[in-house]
């Protein structure tokens, strides 16, 4: 099983459809998208290039808890500009390690500096769960 995981790449499990928001939008705009799409994270783009990320946690900590007006606050003020990312050909193991080392729940996937996808803890958990189940099934047949 370890070999299967070692051979797998981020591109094998990343989400290719990433919901984004333009940099000039407000925190209110972001909150509406998060609610409507039932997601907790957006990639912030400028001219179709990722420039940051914003999460529900950012909104709670930097806007709600600080009593800041979400309707007039630009995303640039609260987004994380130094977001962590991986390339599609990165190993699953290296993606997990990057998440653990940086205490984060998701990674943006960039290919040639362009947004290619996103990978989350949930994606990784489902991938590992499926590998464990397959491995257990194979072992039970032997």
Regions found by a protein language model. Name each.
Residues 1-142:
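Tandem CBS (Cystathionine beta-synthase) repeat/Bateman regulatory domains
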């Amino acid at each position: 099983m370890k070999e299967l995981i070692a051979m797998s790449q981020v591109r094998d499990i990343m989400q290719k459809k990433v919901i984004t928001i333009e940099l000039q939008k407000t925190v209110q705009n972001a909150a509406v998208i998060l609610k409507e799409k039932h997601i907790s994270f957006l990639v912030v783009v400028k001219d179709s290039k990722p420039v940051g990320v914003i999460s529900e946690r950012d909104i709670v900590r930097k806007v709600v808890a600080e009593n800041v007006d979400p309707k007039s606050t630009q995303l640039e003020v609260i987004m994380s500009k130094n977001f962590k990312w991986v390339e599609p050909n990165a190993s699953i193991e290296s993606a997990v390690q990057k998440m653990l080392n940086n205490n984060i729940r998701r990674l943006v996937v960039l290919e040639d500096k362009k947004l290619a996808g996103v990978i989350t803890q949930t994606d990784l958990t489902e991938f590992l769960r499926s590998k464990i189940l397959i491995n257990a099934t194979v072992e039970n047949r032997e």
